[in-house]
Amino acid sequence: MKRILLLSFLISLIASDMNAQAKRYIFMEHFTNTYCGICGARNPSFYSLLTKYEGNYHHMTVHPSFPYTACTLYQANKTENSLRANYYAINSTPTLVIHGTSKKSLSSVNAAVLDAELNKTSPVQVVVKETGSS
């Protein structure tokens, strides 16, 4: 009888663990350009918004060749920057891609958008370790 109870307990524990939801971090790919005046005007408010979500997102910046190919950060990494921009068919900056599926103009990203993403859960947990200071 004890073995049956123990087995039942273990099975229920495993089943409940399978239904657990892992925290979902917001993954953002931010397409911007150092020579882009609109980017220079919108990026500061975007970064200010992100301070409220510290520890809840992963952010990657990509510098495509437009609107200006003279962008220093594009020039430093032409191949990878171009590949990312082409993959998402990015044709203007600043643009934000969230979770690789939702492409938005940076001006349309606000607390409501980020809160909606944070309210989602994931059945799978992936551990990401960030290095660096920015």
Model-flagged regions — what are they?
Residues Q21-P64:
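Local sequence-structure signature of Cys/Sec-based thiol-disulfide redox active-site neighborhoods
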Residues I38-G40, T69-C71, S105-S108:
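Extracytoplasmic/secreted cell-surface and envelope-processing proteins
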Residues H59-R84:
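Extended polysaccharide-engagement surfaces of secreted carbohydrate-active enzymes
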Residues Y74-A76, L83, Y87-V126:
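Non-catalytic, surface beta->alpha helical segment in thiol-disulfide oxidoreductase systems
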